[in-house]
Structure formats: structure tokens, C-alpha cells
Regions:
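A metal-dependent hydrolase metal-coordination microenvironment
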Residues: 33-165, 171, 180, 193, ...
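Surface beta-strand/loop "capping" patches
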Residues: 269-310
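Hydrophobic h-region of N-terminal signal peptides that target proteins for export
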Residues: 11-19
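Conserved small/polar residues in nucleotide/adenosyl-binding loops
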Residues: 323-330
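Structural recognition of alpha->loop->beta junctions
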Residues: 185-205, 245-250, 255-256
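Bacterial N-terminal signal peptides that target proteins for export
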Residues: 1-7
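Short acidic/histidine-rich active-site segments
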Residues: 219-235
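Catalytic cores of secreted or luminal carbohydrate-active enzymes
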Residues: 238-286
Length: 331
């Protein structure tokens, strides 16, 4: 019996040594798969009459209101998607996560500004005054203190923004209403100079009536995401290669330059390969984007030349007939 016990013990000991030797020969870990490469997707745009065409989103949310992401992620998304500037515009009145992240309305901006500086993204300080219609939701951009907008009376909140030199934008005028209307309060705000711009595109909606108001009232045009989710979860980039954005014709790539351009109404709206704006600006973008070669071959009836799009804006030819000033009847 003793002999059997010794043999069994010896066998177990030998097996343990073999297993230890085999384990020592194995690598500690084997990596399978790779992390997604985080690269910036540039959108080439032309310079126009000395103005830089900057790519901006002036309406995004974070966990500091009813968004689901941290402010730094908004900056990282903007960098990857080729933007130059974003405005974090968390709701003043609606902060479901307030008990977890704190009550200060300046927190999101303060948290994101270092990441923005590191990635060369212009970060605009703002907040969304969120009331039922009328007046609806209004973004106050370029404010110094977002906490000052936390007022029970919405007119006091808008006045507080105006006193800080803010640019005030009416958000998604057609969202959540039976009919889109320019109310008396909007006329009052407009006459006071407290309503400076309007979203004609928001998330997945564009508002033709709002475009008419912008032309009639000479308001600045905006197209923004109003993103609460992760951008890549919100938009199917198989349908489009860019998020909705506001293109700003700025004198320079600075926050002050953008602010000046907004008050001067030098903006275009770009969404789903559609470029929207005032005719004179659209014409300038079109002309600055195209390079036309000299005529390189001629016949009695035809002239041959090349037209090159030097930007990443897609242009579709609706009519391939070109007319020259000296031969308007030639085709």
C-alpha cells in the first residue's frame, strides 16, 4: 500500500513539473485585432476673397445636460470629422444627470477646453435656453458665464446673454410643433437685437419656412447636429461622408473671427451633399472651387476644355451645354 502511494505521488509530481514547463513556454498574452485608427478626415474647402471657410457645429450636448458623452469626446469627434470649431450648448433648464456631475453650467466647457487646445479645435462657450414654444429653444453663443443664463424668466435669461455680447440663435423652429410660426415674442426679440440667427437645418430636418424668415429678416443661417448620442451612432456614414455643419467665412481661424462672421451673416449650411445659403456666397464658393483649363482643342462647332473641382464639395452637372460670349448659338 505504501509503495502505491509513493508511485501515485511521484506521478503527480512529474505531471506538475511538465505542466509548469509547458506554461513557461507560452506567451503571456496574444493580441487579436486592432484598435480603430483615429485619423482626421479633412474636408477640403476653398478660400473665398481672403476668408477662410471654417467647418463648425454650434449645437452639441454632453452628459452635463441630456447628452450621453463626456465633453472631451465631443472635441475628439470634432477633430476626427474635420471640424474647426464646436459650441457645447448644454440645456440650462434640463440636466437629468446633474446630481452625478455637478450643477455648474460652465463645467462642460472647462472640462473640454484643454482637449480642444491639444487638438486645435476652437471651442465656443454657450448654453441652450430651453423653454416651450414660444420662444422655444435658443442657443446663446460666445458667453462668458453660462450660469448667468439660469433665470426663471426667459426674457431675463436672453437679456443676460445679450449683455455678455452673445450671439443668439433660434434652434430647430419646426421641432415638436404642429405648425412652424414666427410668434410675437420672436418679433420682439428680433427688434431688440436679441435674435441673430436661426437653424434652417437640425439633426435630420431642414425647414424651408425658416430659410424664408432668414432671408426676410436678414438672420444668420445655421445647420447643426444637435447631437446627444455618439455622432457615429447618430449618423449613417454610408449615406453621407460628413455630419451636418455650418460653414463660416471667417477672416481668421479664431473664436473672435468666427463671432465677427456670424454677426456679419457670412455662413452657409452643408448637409447630405447639399449646400445652402445666400446666392452671392454660394456663387463665390462655386467659382473658388472650380479650375477651368484653357480651350485645348477646337472644331467648327465645339470647344474642348477641362473643369476640375479642387474642393471636396460635390457638384452635379445639370446641363452640359456651355455657351461662350462670342458664339452663344454654338453648342
Amino acid at each position: 500500500m505504501k509503495k502505491t502511494k509513493v508511485l501515485v505521488f511521484a506521478a503527480l509530481l512529474t505531471g506538475g513539473v511538465c505542466m509548469q514547463a509547458q506554461e513557461a513556454a507560452l506567451p503571456k498574452q496574444i493580441k487579436i485585432g486592432k484598435e480603430r485608427v483615429k485619423a482626421r478626415r479633412e474636408l477640403r474647402l476653398p478660400e473665398i476673397d481672403g476668408y477662410q471657410l471654417l467647418k463648425c457645429d454650434f449645437h452639441v450636448h454632453t452628459i452635463f445636460s441630456d447628452g450621453i458623452v463626456w465633453p472631451t469626446l465631443r472635441v475628439q469627434e470634432a477633430w476626427e470629422e474635420g471640424l474647426d470649431a464646436i459650441a457645447i450648448t448644454d440645456h440650462i433648464e434640463g440636466q437629468p444627470a446633474r446630481q452625478h456631475v455637478g450643477k455648474g453650467h460652465n463645467n462642460a466647457f472647462d472640462m473640454a477646453k484643454e482637449e480642444a487646445a491639444r487638438r486645435n479645435i476652437i471651442l465656443v462657450k454657450g448654453g441652450e435656453i430651453t423653454r416651450s414654444m414660444p420662444p422655444g429653444h435658443l442657443n446663446a453663443l460666445f458667453v462668458e458665464d453660462v450660469d448667468a443664463l439660469d433665470q426663471p424668466d426667459y426674457m431675463k435669461a436672453i437679456e443676460a446673454a445679450h449683455k455678455q455680447g452673445a450671439f443668439i440663435q433660434w434652434n430647430h423652429p419646426g421641432w415638436g410643433v404642429d405648425s412652424i410660426m414666427w410668434h410675437d415674442v420672436h418679433e420682439d426679440l428680433y427688434r431688440k437685437g436679441w435674435l441673430n440667427g436661426i437653424e434652417v437645418y437640425n439633426e435630420f430636418e431642414w425647414y424651408p419656412v425658416a430659410l424664408g424668415w432668414a432671408n426676410e429678416k436678414d438672420l444668420t443661417l445655421f445647420g447643426n447636429t444637435d447631437v446627444h448620442d455618439v455622432v457615429e451612432r447618430l449618423y449613417d456614414f454610408r449615406q453621407t461622408d460628413h455630419r451636418p455643419m455650418t460653414l463660416v467665412l471667417s477672416k481668421d481661424r479664431t473664436s473672435d473671427g468666427i463671432k465677427e462672421a456670424l454677426f456679419a451673416r457670412r455662413t452657409l449650411v452643408y448637409f447630405y451633399d447639399t449646400l445652402m445659403g445666400r446666392e452671392e456666397l454660394l456663387q463665390k464658393v462655386f467659382e473658388a472651387s472650380l479650375r477651368v483649363s484653357p480651350v485645348y482643342y477646337s472644331t467648327d462647332k465645339r470647344r474642348y476644355l477641362q473643369i476640375e473641382n479642387t474642393s471636396d464639395l460635390p457638384f452635379r452637372l445639370c446641363n452640359c451645354l456651355l455657351y461662350t460670349s462670342d458664339a452663344a448659338d454654338e453648342r
